[in-house]
């Protein structure tokens, strides 16, 4: 039987400083901000999906009685997300990182020839940019 799941719609990272995250993801990475709810979360459009940035101090709390029944959740420590670059444009991405003083931790080719670069957001989350062919896309 084939899986009924079509794709990942959203993925989440957790940060302690939403202002720093907003400046990084909106300013440095130039993702389109969808919405922000105070010090609880900020959401960004990322291609056909959504990147959710949460403050775990807020999302670990149970939902208010008058709120949607989203279960409490939270993560501590460094997470990871990998972005697929438009047109495999590593030069443009590296320029953006360099212009903003963001260090590249690693830049290499996988055994199948796909390239990946790794760097960190202000919260210490591990971010990767890779070619779709890494996963046969």
Predicted regions and their residues:
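Short, surface-exposed ligand-recognition loops at beta-strand->loop->(often short) alpha-helix junctions
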Residues: 13-16, 85-87
């Amino acid at each position: 039987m084939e899986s009924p799941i079509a794709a990942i719609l959203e993925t989440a990272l957790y940060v302690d400083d939403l202002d720093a995250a907003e400046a990084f993801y909106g300013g440095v990475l130039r993702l389109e901000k969808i919405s922000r709810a105070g010090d609880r979360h900020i959401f960004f459009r990322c291609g056909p999906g959504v990147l959710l940035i949460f403050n775990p101090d807020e999302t670990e709390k149970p939902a208010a009685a008058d709120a949607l029944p989203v279960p409490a959740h939270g993560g501590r420590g460094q997470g990871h997300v990998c972005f697929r670059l438009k047109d495999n444009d590593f030069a443009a991405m590296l320029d953006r990182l360099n212009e903003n003083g963001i260090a590249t931790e690693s830049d290499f080719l996988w055994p199948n020839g796909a390239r990946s670069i790794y760097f960190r957001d202000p919260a210490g989350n591990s971010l990767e940019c890779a070619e779709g062919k890494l996963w046969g896309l």
